[in-house]
């Protein structure tokens, strides 16, 4: 609470902070400065650009940040609600929903390593391992408040017609919809990649929305949430879908979670401070081959392949050097003063490099976990590659918590009627 209050008093923001808040590049801000669209101030000591809070208030994203109601919205409800989750992975969504006050009755996951992770950390959870299509959900009919899950984005076969529930058979969304049909929960909560918005020219999402409506639910318009606004030190975006059963929907409005009032950085993730009460613990991590380490040692914090000498650029990029485009993920070293880039299933892939800001090495398993806001005591099972994959695929815990609290508020409204 004290940190939140201090953040509310902040009156000046750096170039990188404003870039993150507004969702534009630092180069775009420099162009706006030159054009007079958003003129920066200059620090007398180092001549660095900064911006006054008053300058940002006309921007919608900044208003969202400055109007934070985080402490009020994250108060724990006295009511106990239940959740059944599909595609649970390593528990990012489950842990966030648990923090929000939702009690798990079943989690389904097909990956054996992820199931071991769930059982290791929460022996009391009912973890059902295996293909979701083989799970019978009818025993849970009318006993579950929330059905949650992040079904993978898959195309449907249209053949020139509007699709119904049965037409999506064979996809993982069908299994989510089948679970909804069998369980009849009060609320549906689904998450997916931002790309679902435009997948198959928008038809995939339109079909999902239509089927949710056909199942007897009132859908609130899906929204892309930026994790950096929800106390997650990572530039990650997720599409969130929320719907309430028709017989409960009359006069009910869903309020999306408001932002935390500060953009947290990689330093907040890995060092003692506002997010964690200690530095990140040591853990296993991938290693670079000798030549790759030599090349990445030349990249400054926040830099990438264009910061290398031209001959080294050509050596590292090979044919990609001549293809043009930014390719800003290649030979990328993270910065302490910015949120991490989106984590992938491995930290040392050439297209999506995630090099430590000071040491020339990939991020470790525990560093990965902190960036996804898992607690240090959350243990991941399996070989190192499986641990990275579980963490990289997870929903950030704090994002799930924020959404979970908003769903709990929705259920509270339903209960009060």
UniProtKB/Swiss-Prot annotation:
It catalyses: a 2'-deoxycytidine in DNA + S-adenosyl-L-methionine = a 5-methyl-2'-deoxycytidine in DNA + S-adenosyl-L-homocysteine + H(+). The keyword Phosphoprotein does not apply. Belongs to the class I-like SAM-binding methyltransferase superfamily. C5-methyltransferase family. The active site is at 153. Its EC number is 2.1.1.37. One of its GO terms (biological process) is methylation. A methylase that recognizes the double-stranded sequence 5'-GGNCC-3', methylates C-? on both strands, and protects the DNA from cleavage by both the Eco47I and Eco47II endonucleases. Gene3D superfamilies: 1.10.1660.10, DNA Methylase, subunit A, domain 2, Vaccinia Virus protein VP39. It is an enzyme of class 2 (transferase). Pfam families: DNA_methylase, MerR. This is Type II methyltransferase M.Eco47II. Residues 81-414 form the SAM-dependent MTase C5-type domain. One of its GO terms (molecular function) is DNA binding. Keywords: DNA-binding, Methyltransferase, Restriction system, S-adenosyl-L-methionine, Transferase.
